[in-house]
């Protein structure tokens, strides 16, 4: 047997090994380097960012949305770019497609909180007037303390609970389910009512600035991954791509090293796993899985892939738009200007049939029909290109009971932290949750 190669990450300062180069791992690495730690980040993919891709996306535009309530995401974005080089953002309204094919905007008023929430709800024509008034009255009673949320929301589905407060099947289908799918990737019929309320509250029941929806014209790679990677390189962090971790070694309930596929052992003072739960559990010692409920409950977490179809059409885009959909496999469509004479459409789905990256003329036809029905694709325009990007494990199932199984960042192992959008952050599993979890891991290390 070949001798075991031991790689020690630092001898002059406390060191941290981070497994996973997705948003959570990158956020933790960036924060830790600013706190003076020596960081080694390991990822099994050729590119950081967490996508299942082989091409280099650094020069590819992939617009994405950021909500005003995503404070950690906004703070990281501003930290990575000087004031003059901040990525271009444009505020956009939220649109819904009704059963008759018409589109309605969710209104935004300039009233202070919480009056703006109540006024916006009453003005929203996507919900029948009687249901609007009933819901607005109920929300007002919550504010005044005359009504309380039920204690069993985590044990009930969102669909059942919304029906119990007077929201009709049609309203749930055209308004609440599209919102739930856009914010969490989950359907009302499968997610818990608590997860639904948690995802809605920051955007609709907070300040007016928190309800702002902005589209960033660039890509996540350009806005986050590239500048973080450049910063890590400049401060001397060690970056290992295309590298598999196979086991976490331990001594006396502390991590003693990470065994890599090539047989070498990576050692540090601290360890942060920023991996999906299904990739984390195979690395753990068997005795931990049976001894600690913290690790045992990871098996209860179920996740699925998310696929984004990037479609370019030969027509200009006057203004960006975001439309939430129903009665289709696609959750939403975001329209932005790819170039002055080209429009880019980003369609999100969790349907696995769209994850296969192969030519499909039927798909192009279906996409053209969908975009034309929304008034986004002109009759004389055609689709010039279609590209897919699949993010594995991006959607965590928020079925009833899941909240109890999402772990906090501090594990029962003294020098092991756990990061990821799927951990317990108070957010649904999204970019904000990933960044918050990475920040918390870094802060937990700094405070010990």
Identify the function of each model-found stretch.
Residues 2, 35, 92, 243-360, ...:
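Mid-domain catalytic core of redox enzymes
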Residues 48-68, 145:
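Glycine-rich active-site loop/strand segments that organize a redox cofactor
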Residues 73-74, 78, 84-193:
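Mobile amphipathic helical/loop "lid" adjacent to a hydrophobic cofactor/ligand pocket
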Residues 24, 47, 278:
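Conserved Rossmann-like nucleotide-cofactor binding loop
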Residues 3-9, 333-448:
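Conserved flavin/dinucleotide-binding core of flavoenzymes
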Residues 199-255, 259:
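Helical element adjacent to the flavin cofactor pocket in flavoenzyme catalytic cores
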Residues 34-55:
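Glycine-rich FAD pyrophosphate-binding loop
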Residues 14-40:
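N-terminal Rossmann-like FAD-binding beta1-loop-alpha1 element of flavoenzymes
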């Amino acid at each position: 047997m070949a001798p075991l190669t031991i790689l020690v990450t630092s001898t002059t300062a406390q060191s941290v090994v981070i497994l996973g180069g997705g948003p959570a791992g990158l956020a933790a690495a960036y924060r830790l380097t600013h706190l003076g730690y020596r960081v080694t980040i390991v990822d099994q993919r050729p590119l950081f960012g967490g996508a299942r891709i082989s091409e280099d996306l650094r020069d590819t535009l992939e617009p994405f949305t950021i909500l005003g309530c995503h404070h950690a995401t906004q703070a990281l974005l501003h930290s990575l770019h000087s004031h003059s080089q901040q990525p271009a953002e444009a505020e956009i309204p939220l649109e819904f497609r009704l059963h008759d094919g018409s589109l309605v905007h969710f209104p935004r008023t300039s009233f202070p909180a919480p009056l703006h929430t109540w006024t916006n709800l009453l003005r929203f024509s996507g919900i029948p007037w009687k249901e609007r008034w009933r819901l607005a009255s109920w929300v007002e009673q919550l504010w005044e303390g005359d009504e309380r949320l039920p204690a069993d929301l985590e044990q009930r589905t969102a669909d059942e609970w919304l029906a119990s407060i007077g929201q009709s099947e049609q309203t749930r289908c055209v308004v609440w389910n599209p919102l739930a799918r856009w914010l969490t990737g989950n359907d009302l019929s499968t997610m818990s009512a608590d997860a639904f309320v948690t995802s809605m509250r920051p955007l609709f029941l907070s300040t007016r600035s928190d309800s702002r929806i902005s589209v960033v014209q660039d890509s996540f790679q350009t806005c986050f991954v590239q500048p973080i990677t450049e910063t890590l390189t400049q401060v001397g962090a060690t970056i290992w791509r295309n590298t598999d971790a196979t086991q976490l070694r331990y001594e006396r309930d502390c991590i003693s090293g990470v065994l890599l596929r090539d047989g070498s052992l990576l050692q540090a003072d601290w360890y942060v796993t920023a991996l999906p739960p299904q990739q984390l559990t195979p690395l753990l010692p068997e005795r931990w899985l049976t001894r600690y409920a913290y690790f045992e409950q990871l098996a209860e977490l179920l996740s699925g892939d998310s696929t984004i179809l990037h479609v370019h059409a030969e027509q200009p885009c006057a203004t960006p738009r975001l439309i939430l959909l129903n009665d289709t496999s696609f959750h939403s469509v975001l329209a932005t200007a790819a170039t002055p004479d080209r429009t880019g459409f980003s369609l999100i789905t969790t349907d696995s049939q769209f994850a296969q990256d192969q030519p499909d003329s039927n798909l192009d036809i279906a996409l053209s029909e969908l975009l034309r029905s929304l008034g986004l694709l002109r009759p004389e325009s055609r689709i010039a290109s279609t590209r897919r990007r699949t993010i594995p494990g991006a959607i965590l199932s928020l079925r009833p009971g899941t909240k109890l199984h999402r772990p906090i960042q501090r594990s029962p192992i003294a020098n092991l932290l756990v990061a990821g959008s799927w951990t317990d952050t108070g957010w649904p599993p999204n970019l904000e949750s990933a960044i918050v979890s990475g920040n918390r891991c870094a802060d937990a290390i700094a405070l010990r």
